[in-house]
Curated annotation (Swiss-Prot):
Organism name: Xenopus laevis
TM ranges: 5-25, 134-154, 228-248
CDD domains: DnaJ
Family to which the UniProt record says this protein belongs: Belongs to the DNAJC25 family.
Name of this protein: DnaJ homolog subfamily C member 25
GO cellular component, one term: endoplasmic reticulum membrane
Residues covered by the J domain: 33-108
Subcellular location: Membrane
Membrane disposition: Multi-pass membrane protein
Tagged with keyword Protein biosynthesis: no
GO process terms (BP): protein folding
Keywords, alphabetical: Chaperone, Membrane, Transmembrane, Transmembrane helix
Amino acid sequence: MQPRWVLLVALSVLFLSGRAGALTEGLYCGRQVCYDVLGVSRDANKGDIARAYRQLARKYHPDRYRPGDQLGPDGETRESAQEKFILVATAYETLKDEETRKDYDYMLDHPEEYYRHYYHYYSRRLAPKVDVRIVILVSVCAVSIFQYYSWWSSYNEAINYLATVTKYRIQAMEIAKQQGLLNRTKEKGKNRRSKEEIKSEEEEIIRDIIKNKIDIKGGYQKPQIFDILLFQIILFPYYMFKYISWYVRWIYTFNIQGKEYGEEEKLYLIRKYMKMSQSQFDTLEEHRKNTFLEQKLWIKENYEVYRQEQEEETKKKMASDPRWKRYRRWMKNEGPGRLTFADD
């Protein structure tokens, strides 16, 4: 029987030494076990832990001890009570959170993984407490606001530029005269204004007419609230459903039933072959789109012929361009500069 008792004592010593080795100063409750600090077992639920914390917090709260008193109601000094209150609060913060409690229990059971315990402890303490979803939402809103105002800035720049182009300016002036808008600026008598005021009002009238009459396409088009990132994310399920419906209709109508393409479908195929976005394609003039349709570029073979012709034409233009001639001459005679590490 004696060897069996010796074995049990040895195992108990190893268990206690391992448990003590897991308690490191600076981690959680230091050299004390957080469960023992609160007087609860490792099987205690959140309710038991919260009740134990409230009792001990009332017992050791520093406000119960006056600065001049040597001993408080429970025979504690103000300093010792404050230390115990902090320890109780630390134990509660450790055990009330499920993830932190799992890490702490793992530390008690695996004291040999010293560096892992340090990593998990400080990674949780130093991790930001802000909800990631809030951070993402704020970031999306900030990007959306920046998008919207930058698009308005680009749109106003385009309007200001078009107001200086003679072609559009003359058209806007004619429309303003027909509507009698310019006559109002030339008032007489007491209501007469300076030339600067009249000119400023005329410019504003011209800009307003250009805004209303000219449909700007592409990157300088008038901003739409539903184009910003926030609404694109919100409406993504709708756009996805719309695309799937369109794709299924395309397959059924043209691949299965074999119907001919309409003008909209032909332009879509042409744009797809040209690898242009919708906004880029919209900036093309109508006569160019009509030319594409006349050349039947929605047919892949016709488009390949058109693309090769365009490449040949571009090469001819570059060959006859004086700037490209000078560049080729320079490349042939001198070439680009080179870095060398050779000693002079």
